[in-house]
Amino acid sequence: MGLISHPVKLKNLVEQYNIKNFVESGTGSGDSMKVIVESGLFDNFHGIELDEEMYDDLVDRFPDVVNFYNGYSKDEMPNVLNNIDDSPTLFWLDAHFPGSDYQGLAYDSEKDDEKRIPLQVELKIISENRDISKDII
């Protein structure tokens, strides 16, 4: 997942499209989420993290601020979508299996393509469950 380190660059985009919700898959250590929360640009924050230990750390790091979901994004994205309104949303999507980033595993250690490279499934779930015409992905 690419790190968001310059929320000022997002400001014009967020204001132009009246973005209210921020959804991140593959939240990892939460560094990007921290930048987003502190930016004050969004009203609602949602993050999906596969690794249970990292998920627990995220919940402790952002109590009562971010709604976190623990599991594969293909399983948790429907839950996220059920918990956001139809306001314009910025989806910051992960595009790979996190094993090599955090667990020292090879990218090909996960044989299920939908888990190893979740981006296509995430896009499908989002587009089938909401009007994406006002969202940014």
Feature roles, as predicted:
Residues 1-90, 96-137:
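A short alpha-helical cap/connector motif
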